């Protein structure tokens, strides 16, 4: 049986503390004293990022800071990149921003310390999401945004839910989807969803569908059944892999 950690235990496990000073305003020397490994002197970038995220959340929660009103990338530029640059941590390339995305996933979906929406992030997936009522728990979703109009047309015929992921599923967008389903009253006490995945017949499409399923589980949807649907025309005569 899994043990549920308290908030204090989760924060300790992640190396997060309630510092009295705004970490964004500290000098490189002050930051190094807090976040350098004792053995090597190298900066623990992941711990820096998680503490910056926690400070942003608590400041917004307590009314000491306005909501982000942007996306994760804008948060990277305003809160994370300047601090890491000051510490000499590499900030160019995809891996640097992925550290931020990974940190949020840990804090939001593993430890459940807060919601993305608590920080005021934009619901960028709202434009490619249409929640049904009668069959709202049946979700027809596409890998690519360009297929959203088709997904919506088909879903509307059955008052189901239509969605386009825009590529690899975003944990932030998935949270907003679940929140929208809850707000619409289509998720029962024991949440269960039927997913109809319109993805490419390739390894990427396979993993996109399954990652989306895993994210829904992480946000409390207990039962998720995935029904893969073949989308790429050149493969239409071939059986879909499950």
State where each predicted segment sits.
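Short glycine-rich or small-residue beta-strand-to-loop segments that form or flank ligand, phosphate
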Residues: 195-202
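Nucleic-acid enzyme cleavage-core boundary/entry regions
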Residues: 1-193, 206-242
């Amino acid at each position: 049986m899994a043990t549920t950690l308290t908030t204090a235990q989760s924060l300790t496990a992640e190396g997060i503390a309630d510092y009295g000073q705004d970490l964004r305003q500290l000098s490189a020397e002050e930051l190094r004293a807090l976040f350098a490994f004792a053995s090597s002197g190298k900066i623990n970038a992941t711990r820096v990022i998680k503490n910056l995220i926690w400070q942003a959340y608590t400041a917004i929660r307590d009314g000491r800071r306005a909501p982000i009103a942007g996306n994760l990338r804008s948060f990277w530029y305003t809160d994370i990149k300047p601090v890491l640059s000051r510490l000499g941590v590499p900030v160019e390339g995809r891996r640097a921003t992925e550290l931020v995305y990974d940190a949020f996933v840990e804090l939001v979906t593993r430890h459940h310390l807060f919601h993305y929406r608590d920080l005021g992030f934009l619901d960028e997936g709202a434009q490619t999401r249409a929640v049904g009522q009668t069959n709202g728990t049946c979700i027809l979703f596409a890998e690519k945004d360009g297929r959203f109009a088709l997904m919506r047309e088909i879903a509307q015929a059955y008052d189901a839910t239509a969605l386009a992921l825009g590529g690899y599923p975003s944990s932030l967008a998935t949270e907003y989807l679940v929140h929208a389903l809850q707000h619409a009253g289509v998720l029962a006490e024991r949440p269960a969803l039927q997913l109809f995945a319109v993805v490419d017949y390739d390894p990427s499409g396979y993993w996109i569908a399954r990652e989306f399923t895993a994210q829904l589980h992480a946000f409390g949807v207990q039962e998720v059944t995935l029904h893969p649907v073949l989308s790429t025309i050149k493969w239409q005569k071939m059986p879909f892999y499950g």
